[in-house]
Amino acid sequence: MAFLKKSLFLVLFLGLVSLSICDEEKRQDEDDDDDDDEEKRGVFDIIKDAGKQLVAHAMGKIAEKV
């Protein structure tokens, strides 16, 4: 009976350790994804600002001709 208890304890312990390792890796992956999203947002903001400036410049040129 003691052998079964030790075996069960070992299986549960190893299962918890592997779960905690997987959980830690998952958190790291989520953090990496968040960093990528922030970089994408930064790039889109730059493109959006450049587009606004381009449209404003074009509208200024059109207004000068009229």
Curated annotation (Swiss-Prot):
> A biological process (GO) annotation for this entry?
defense response to bacterium
| Signal peptide (UniProt feature, chain positions) | 1-22
Q: Which Pfam families match?
A: FSAP_sig_propep
Give residue ranges for the propeptide.
Answer: 23-39
Q: Residues bearing Valine amide?
A: 66
Q: Where in the cell is it found?
A: Secreted
Kindly state the tissue distribution recorded for this protein.
Expressed by the skin glands.
Report the InterPro entries cross-referenced here.
Frog_antimicrobial_propeptide, FSAP
Q: Which GO terms describe its cellular component?
A: extracellular region
Keywords associated with the record: Amidation, Amphibian defense peptide, Antibiotic, Antimicrobial, Cleavage on pair of basic residues, Secreted, Signal
Task: Give the family from UniProt.
Answer: Belongs to the frog skin active peptide (FSAP) family. Ocellatin subfamily.
What does the UniProt function comment say about this protein? Answer: Has antibacterial activity against Gram-negative bacterium E.coli ATCC 25922 (MIC=300 uM) but not against S.pneumoniae ATCC 700603, S.choleraesuis ATCC 14028 or Gram-positive bacterium S.aureus ATCC 29313. Shows virtually no hemolytic activity and no cytotoxicity.
The molecule here is called: Ocellatin-PT1
